[in-house]
Amino acid sequence: MGGGLLAATLPAQAHRAKAALTLVRWNAAAKLLEVEHKLHAHDAEVALSQQAGIATPDLSRLEDQAKLALYVEARFSLTPPGGKPLALKLLGAELEGDHIFVYQELALQAPPQALAVEDGILRDVFRTQLNQVNFDMAGGDPAHIRTLTFNGQDKAESVTFDR
């Protein structure tokens, strides 16, 4: 017989990491600080079940999307040095495939120079949750992108922006 390829099939052991991504972006044209949170829909539904008391959450329902948006709003903050947390306006949420997006924004005259960030999203539900916050304050210039990560018992982290 000729040389063949033997392929063994093993049960899939892949496990999706518990992670969320937030993008904080300065929109210079609109003078807006825009915040976009991206969560895995299943993880968000578990959070709604455990933290909001919804027996069977369904993120295709607008009511459950609104409750998730309020959950996210309560667990994420941006605070300028020596100031109070920014009053981010909650815009809403939308489901796209396996992910749910929550949107916030705030009108400002100029982008902040520095921020203290707290990100407890899903960290009260999953012990191994890892949250990444990316900051784009310079129109997408990769040299000016800043990143913070939150896991375990992390509290506020600080970030500064150079232009």
Where on the chain are the PLM-derived regions?
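N-terminal export leaders
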Residues: 1-2
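Boundary at the C-terminal end of the N-terminal hydrophobic targeting segment
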Residues: 7, 12-14
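N-terminal soluble domains immediately following signal/targeting peptides that reside
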Residues: 14-163
